[in-house]
Amino acid sequence: MAHKKGASSTRNGRDSNAQRLGVKRFGGQVVGAGEIIVRQRGTHFHPGVNVGRGGDDTLFALSAGSVEFGVKGGRKVVNIVVPA
C-alpha cells in the first residue's frame, strides 16, 4: 500500500477569509441610529444606554449621538450620549 497519495494531491491549501471584527466607531465619534459600533464574537463589550445587541453580538446605536466607552460593574460597556 502506498504511503504517498500520488501526484497533484494535497491536503493543504485552505485559508478562510478575515471576519472584519473590531470597533467601527470610536469614543467621541458621532453616530446615527442603526450604525454599527462594534463587530465582535461574544460579549467583549456589553451594550449600555441607547445601544442594542444583534444576534451575532454586534453592538449598534439605537439613537443618534456620540459614542462613549466605559466600565460598569466590571464590564466594558458602550453608551450613546444623546445631545440635550
Swiss-Prot record:
One of its GO terms (cellular component) is cytosolic large ribosomal subunit. InterPro entries: Ribosomal_bL27, Ribosomal_bL27_CS. Coiled coil: none annotated. PROSITE patterns: RIBOSOMAL_L27 (PS00831). Residues 1-21 are annotated as: Disordered. One of its GO terms (molecular function) is structural constituent of ribosome. GO terms for biological process: translation. Belongs to the bacterial ribosomal protein bL27 family. HAMAP family: Ribosomal_bL27. This is Large ribosomal subunit protein bL27. It comes from Clavibacter sepedonicus. The lineage of its organism: Bacteria, Bacillati, Actinomycetota, Actinomycetes, Micrococcales.
